[in-house]
Design a protein with these regions (language model features):
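Shared catalytic-loop signature of beta/alpha-barrel
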Residues: 1-100
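C-terminal extensions of enzymes
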Residues: 87-125
Length: 125
């Protein structure tokens, strides 16, 4: 779904048992946070946003932390995707410890690319 209005309507209709946000379709971090809060209000658990693409694991790990620390306080029934490739292009790549994403230690979104990786794939047309 593309926005909080659609999520709210589906939540009001009782359609979801579990909600998984697509971080690439919604309007940024604020929208994702709002969708977590809406789901919590309606008693629907959220699995963190899809992480199946270049840089998406780095981008969505923060939302899993936000859910645990500020919304649900739950780890037990939360599942997050992990794609084990192309992390070498990022300054702060995602790390997995004991089957869980390791909390980021640097500020920011976590999707800062290494300069050499950006230059390698830069369109030179």
């Amino acid at each position: 779904m593309q926005n909080r209005i659609m999520y709210k309507q589906y939540l009001q209709a009782g359609i979801f048992k579990v909600m998984q946000i697509d971080a690439t379709r919604v309007a940024g971090p604020q929208e994702i946070v709002l969708e977590y809060l809406l789901a919590n209000k309606f008693g629907v658990r959220v699995c963190p946003p899809h992480a199946g693409g270049v840089g998406l694991c780095e981008a969505v790990r923060h939302f899993a932390m936000f859910d645990y620390l500020a919304v649900s306080g739950q780890w037990d029934d939360r599942v997050i995707e992990y794609v084990d490739n192309q992390h070498e292009y990022f300054v702060h790549p995602t790390e997995i410890v004991n089957g869980r994403y390791k909390a980021p230690t640097a500020p920011g979104s976590g999707v800062d690319m290494k300069l050499e990786a950006a230059e390698r794939y830069l369109y030179k047309g």
